[in-house]
């Protein structure tokens, strides 16, 4: 049963994270440690050999999954623990990109005067964690996936997308098809 195996993996990850957090607490480091916990993409939804059930439904209500530019492939939850800074038990539905982690971690670490070989693409999301601002407001996000994942499905293979607010446009290189979405809650 694929779902039982998947649940076992999740249970193992949960146990490992719990062990780490217990160690930090036991050794007096919990209040001096920032934890960022997230996935790198939506769940695998385009192949039946790893999961049970109909394809492209594993991230319901979001459409599709890993390798897709639909919301099931690019929207992932994230948990942040930053004692004394990020308010516990709060929720934020703003969006960001992986490129935002580098400037965020630098800011969290108090690194201010640094030099880079090239410009930093990301924007620190510390204001979202402190409740002092919204760096995603008015910002466009871009994805380019000109590769073949070996499977086909919603938002998968040879495409690119741009998102601004609740609007997203997906363009399929192979067919020239365009899909425009508004209100990204269920796509």
Language model features with spans:
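Beta-strand elements within well-structured catalytic alpha/beta cores of enzymes
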Residues: 6, 10, 17, 34-39, ...
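Metal-dependent active-site segment of extracytoplasmic phospho-/sulfohydrolases and closely related
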Residues: 12-49
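Alpha-amylase-like alpha-glycosidases and glucanotransferases acting on alpha-linked glucans and related
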Residues: 37, 68, 74-75
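Conserved small/polar residues in nucleotide/adenosyl-binding loops
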Residues: 185-187
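Aromatic- and acidic-residue-enriched carbohydrate-binding clefts of CAZyme catalytic domains
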Residues: 1-2, 56
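C-terminal cap/loop subdomain of S1 sulfatases and analogous C-terminal strand-loop tails that border
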Residues: 43-69, 86-94, 99-181
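Catalytic nucleophile-loop/oxyanion-hole region of alpha/beta-hydrolase
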Residues: 2-11, 95
């Amino acid at each position: 049963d694929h779902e039982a195996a998947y649940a076992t993996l999740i249970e193992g990850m949960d146990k490992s994270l719990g062990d780490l957090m217990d160690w930090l607490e036991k050794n007096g480091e919990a209040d001096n440690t920032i934890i960022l916990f997230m996935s790198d993409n939506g769940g695998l939804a385009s192949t039946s050999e790893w999961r049970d059930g109909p394809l492209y439904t594993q991230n319901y209500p979001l459409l599709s999954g890993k390798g897709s530019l639909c919301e099931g492939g690019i929207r992932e939850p994230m948990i942040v623990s930053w004692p004394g800074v990020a308010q516990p038990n709060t929720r934020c539905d703003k969006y960001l990109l992986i490129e935002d982690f580098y400037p965020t971690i630098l800011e969290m670490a108090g690194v201010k005067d640094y030099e880079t070989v090239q410009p930093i693409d990301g924007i620190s999301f510390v204001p979202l964690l402190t409740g002092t601002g919204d760096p995603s407001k008015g910002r466009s996000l871009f994805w380019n996936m000109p590769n073949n994942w070996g499977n086909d499905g919603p938002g998968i293979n040879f495409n690119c997308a741009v998102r601004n607010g609740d609007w997203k446009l997906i363009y399929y290189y192979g067919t020239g098809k365009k899909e425009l979405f508004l209100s990204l809650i269920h796509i």
